[in-house]
Amino acid sequence: MKKEQVLNCQFSQWYPRFKKLSIRSVVIPLPENVKDYLLDDGTLVVSGREESPGCSQRDLNSTAEDEVQWSDDENTATLKAPEFPEFSIKVQEAINSLGGSVFPKLNWSSPRDAYWIALNSSLKCQTLSDIFLLFKSSDFVTHDFTQPFIYCADDSPDPNIKYELVLRKWCELIPGAEFRCFVKENNLIGISQRDYTQYYDHISKQKEEIRKSIQYFFQEHIQYNFPDEDFVFDVYKDSQGKIWLIDFNPFGEVTDSLLFTWDELRRSWNLSDVENEEQDCPTFRYTNSEVTVQPSPFLSYRLPKDFVDLSTGEDAHKLIDFLKLNRNEQDEDSD
């Protein structure tokens, strides 16, 4: 895998070409100070919105959760979350233009490993503070920032990356309708059930129809239209049978191979299964009823140090920020 292949899978690189096949999205350049904040281990969240000037009744009635001060014998310091007013306005305008709820991601990754920390246990975001909470809790997002070329074989200097916040219109996608597709030398060699930890009866019953519809979609819209010969793409098959393009990923270890192994994907001649007699038909792997349902691969991400600090009170700054976020959400609901 080469660095150029990783760069080609950035959302803003492929979305303009395949826009009509995918979910409506908005891309916003990520300011350097926002990137620094997301990588900072200090403050957990920010308000994500500008407060109106003047003194309101809520200001007068603010509790210890709203104005927290740390004092010693000689001085007093006020804990204040950082603000990004211009960026916040752009983000909120984009969210509103996409219907009020979005699915956020960076150039490559979404914070799928951090969904559990959100108040709604979902990646559905309506404010910048929702996005910040997920991003600062996600190892996947941190990887985008710090190790995007970790598995690349070329020794050339790492290219300069212009980081972007990607906001996708929120859609209620059924996990059992998502599939990952593996392409080698511009040939679709394998399809895997995306949520392989669960058994879905409809996949078993419709396996041939699913395989053929994805292969047709690939041949009509994707094949020879992506800059690389080897790549991975994700699709969603809706209730009407329409295939939607969700994402592109590099062909290599940085991408989860799901029900395949990377060794067999590289040796594509070794993929054929008993049921697949057509030479040019991709191998389709899915979880069948005989296989024991597996735990979610994201379970290992559910107890980061930030969460332990919150639960034990060892990091007072993060605890106060979390309380502030809850208070802000409650105040907005009452407005």
UniProtKB/Swiss-Prot annotation:
<protein>
    <recommendedName>
        <fullName>Translation initiation factor eIF2 assembly protein</fullName>
    </recommendedName>
</protein>
<feature type="binding site">
    <location>
        <position position="105"/>
    </location>
    <ligand>
        <name>ATP</name>
    </ligand>
</feature>
<dbReference type="GO" id="GO:0044183">
    <property type="term" value="F:protein folding chaperone"/>
</dbReference>
<dbReference type="InterPro" id="IPR009772">
    <property type="entry name" value="CDC123"/>
</dbReference>
<feature type="binding site">
    <location>
        <position position="108"/>
    </location>
    <ligand>
        <name>ATP</name>
    </ligand>
</feature>
<feature type="binding site">
    <location>
        <position position="168"/>
    </location>
    <ligand>
        <name>ATP</name>
    </ligand>
</feature>
<keyword id="KW-0067">ATP-binding</keyword>
<feature type="binding site">
    <location>
        <position position="110"/>
    </location>
    <ligand>
        <name>ATP</name>
    </ligand>
</feature>
<keyword id="KW-0963">Cytoplasm</keyword>
<comment type="function">
    <text>ATP-dependent protein-folding chaperone for the eIF2 complex. Binds to the gamma subunit of the eIF2 complex which allows the subunit to assemble with the alpha and beta subunits.</text>
</comment>
<keyword id="KW-0547">Nucleotide-binding</keyword>
<comment type="similarity">
    <text>Belongs to the CDC123 family.</text>
</comment>
<feature type="binding site">
    <location>
        <position position="170"/>
    </location>
    <ligand>
        <name>ATP</name>
    </ligand>
</feature>
<feature type="binding site">
    <location>
        <position position="234"/>
    </location>
    <ligand>
        <name>ATP</name>
    </ligand>
</feature>
<dbReference type="GO" id="GO:1905143">
    <property type="term" value="P:eukaryotic translation initiation factor 2 complex assembly"/>
</dbReference>
<dbReference type="Pfam" id="PF07065">
    <property type="entry name" value="D123"/>
</dbReference>
<feature type="binding site">
    <location>
        <position position="247"/>
    </location>
    <ligand>
        <name>Mg(2+)</name>
    </ligand>
</feature>
<keyword id="KW-0143">Chaperone</keyword>
<feature type="binding site">
    <location>
        <position position="171"/>
    </location>
    <ligand>
        <name>ATP</name>
    </ligand>
</feature>
<feature type="binding site">
    <location>
        <position position="247"/>
    </location>
    <ligand>
        <name>ATP</name>
    </ligand>
</feature>
<dbReference type="GO" id="GO:0005737">
    <property type="term" value="C:cytoplasm"/>
</dbReference>
<feature type="binding site">
    <location>
        <position position="194"/>
    </location>
    <ligand>
        <name>ATP</name>
    </ligand>
</feature>
<keyword id="KW-0479">Metal-binding</keyword>
<feature type="binding site">
    <location>
        <position position="249"/>
    </location>
    <ligand>
        <name>ATP</name>
    </ligand>
</feature>
<feature type="binding site">
    <location>
        <position position="112"/>
    </location>
    <ligand>
        <name>ATP</name>
    </ligand>
</feature>
<keyword id="KW-0460">Magnesium</keyword>
<feature type="binding site">
    <location>
        <position position="249"/>
    </location>
    <ligand>
        <name>Mg(2+)</name>
    </ligand>
</feature>
<dbReference type="GO" id="GO:0005524">
    <property type="term" value="F:ATP binding"/>
</dbReference>
<feature type="binding site">
    <location>
        <position position="178"/>
    </location>
    <ligand>
        <name>ATP</name>
    </ligand>
</feature>
<feature type="binding site">
    <location>
        <position position="169"/>
    </location>
    <ligand>
        <name>ATP</name>
    </ligand>
</feature>
<feature type="binding site">
    <location>
        <position position="180"/>
    </location>
    <ligand>
        <name>ATP</name>
    </ligand>
</feature>
<dbReference type="GO" id="GO:0000287">
    <property type="term" value="F:magnesium ion binding"/>
</dbReference>
